[in-house]
Amino acid sequence: RPKPSSSGSWSFTYVMEPNCAKTGGVCGLYEYCPEHRRQEKGLCGENWSNQGVECCSGIPLNVKDCRTRGGQCTSKCGNAPFDEEPTCPEGEKCCFYE
């Protein structure tokens, strides 16, 4: 849900809504969901859709925090998928374990 950023302004990351979650998605700002990950419109409910929030089959691109993305910061990921984009301490990657 909307939360204050470090600058004090409000930002939106994502929210779980049942209809979207059933498709494996999360509700996030439509503009931050890559085109190939956009789900059917309206799965997040009318109230959210009116605010530019739609169902995305991945974590929206504006979410940079590793834990929020479902990962864990560590220096070695082994064979696990990883992302160097989210915020992790220097020398660590955001690893996604099952």
Curated annotation (Swiss-Prot):
Q: What is its main location?
A: secreted
Keyword Translocase listed? The answer is no
Lyase as a keyword of this entry, yes or no, is: no
GO molecular function per UniProt: toxin activity
Give the location in the cell: Secreted
Q: Where is the signal peptide?
A: 1-7
**What do the Gene Ontology cellular component annotations say?**
extracellular region
Question: What post-translational modification information does the record give?
Answer: Contains 6 disulfide bonds.
Tissues expressing this chain: Expressed by the venom gland.
Q: Which domain of life is it from?
A: Eukaryota
The alphabetical list of record keywords is: Disulfide bond, Secreted, Signal, Toxin
The text of the family note is: Belongs to the scoloptoxin-19 family.
- Which protein, by its recorded name, is this? U-scoloptoxin(19)-Tl1a
Q: Which species is this record about?
A: Thereuopoda longicornis
